[in-house]
């Protein structure tokens, strides 16, 4: 034993660095998770192992999982976390191959022979990107095949979406959207969505035979090897378009979006409104009635907060003189209680500072749209 062996840091590993995730197709692509605290605790540190490496690999088509934990030494302490057992508890039981890589390869190679999402799932849309064809499917979790696939991929939600949890697969209101390469059948990403009953008032409840629903995007993930290639926007648009065409859905929402998804959503929603001619409408009429705006919001199936943001962005895009007034009015109402208790001059300054932050953020989004198109 060397002197270093008595230092705690010798036996302490970053869980984010120790866990090596791979998606294996023609080539293996390895990457690190963003988060491991759901598995290894809030500190994301693992104590008791030297030179720890945790391999978590998936076949790029079937996502058959494989785990292999390696280390050069382990402390003989009963309190040391069993890192392999801990990881396996988050993976589908009796479906993971542990340590036997040859067996894993044989298993997914055999499974690939009959693996075909198009035989089981409902096709939503398809698109071309960089000379390749991609298909979007959807499924409920009632189907055994869909449940097996979701159990294999759901750990990616924990590793790449902050504060994510496993969904209740026994709830029939969940639907999963799947994105795959049409030729290779490689899975590119997936989205969990949920439908809530939407109460529209007593009159509507009495008259409508068919129930109406809010549709929610919950977990949205493009796997790391396929990110920053345009798939996120294509998948998002496919889902939104399918909901716009679904007469039972009255409103589209997103659950706790992070900043990156907010940007993706804003860019795509703005471009959709511009294609529908709202850009021209706001250019001609900067002072639109509340009735027109509410009617537009409902036809676009947008929640109020998102619709108001898009209206403000369109006003800024068209250099409308009403942009500043509209934003400040919204900010004042939102922060009324705090501003009402503040010195008038300081309140005006705070309102102006908030307005500048909103304006700068909108400009950033608009510039990213112009850059992607130009």
Curated annotation (Swiss-Prot):
Question: Where acetyl-CoA is bound, by residue?
Answer: 220-222, 227-233, 258, 267
**For the modification Phosphoserine, which residues carry it?**
354
Q: Which family does it belong to?
A: Belongs to the HAT1 family.
Q: Which reaction does it catalyse?
A: L-lysyl-[protein] + acetyl-CoA = N(6)-acetyl-L-lysyl-[protein] + CoA + H(+)
Q: Where is this region: Interaction with histone H4 N-terminus?
A: 42-44, 194-196
Gene Ontology annotations of biological process type: double-strand break repair; subtelomeric heterochromatin formation
Q: State the oligomer form and interacting partners.
A: Component of the HAT-B complex composed of at least HAT1 and HAT2. In the cytoplasm, this complex binds to the histone H4 tail. In the nucleus, the HAT-B complex has an additional component, the histone H3/H4 chaperone HIF1.
- Region ranges (Interaction with HAT2): 197-205
Annotated N-acetyltransferase domain residues: 135-303
To which species is this protein native? Saccharomyces cerevisiae (strain ATCC 204508 / S288c)
Q: What is its EC number?
A: 2.3.1.48
Where in the cell is the protein located? Cytoplasm; Nucleus
Q: Which UniProt keywords apply?
A: Acyltransferase, Chromatin regulator, Cytoplasm, DNA damage, DNA repair, Nucleus, Phosphoprotein, Transferase
The UniProt entry lists the main location of this chain as cytoplasm
**First-level EC class:** transferase
Name the job this protein performs. Catalytic component of the histone acetylase B (HAT-B) complex. Acetylates 'Lys-12' of free histone H4 in the cytoplasm. The complex is also found in the nucleus, however it is not certain that it modifies histone H4 when packaged in chromatin. Histone H4 'Lys-12' acetylation is required for telomeric silencing. Has intrinsic substrate specificity that modifies lysine in recognition sequence GXGKXG. Involved in DNA double-strand break repair.
Pfam families on file: Acetyltransf_1, HAT1_C_fung, Hat1_N
Changing residue 214 to A has the effect of:
Impairs interaction with HAT2
Q: Name one GO cellular component term.
A: nucleus
* Listed name of the protein: Histone acetyltransferase type B catalytic subunit
Q: Which PANTHER family match?
A: HISTONE ACETYLTRANSFERASE TYPE B CATALYTIC SUBUNIT (PTHR12046)
Q: What residues sit in the active site? A: 255
GO MF terms held by the record: chromatin binding; histone acetyltransferase activity; histone binding; histone H4 acetyltransferase activity
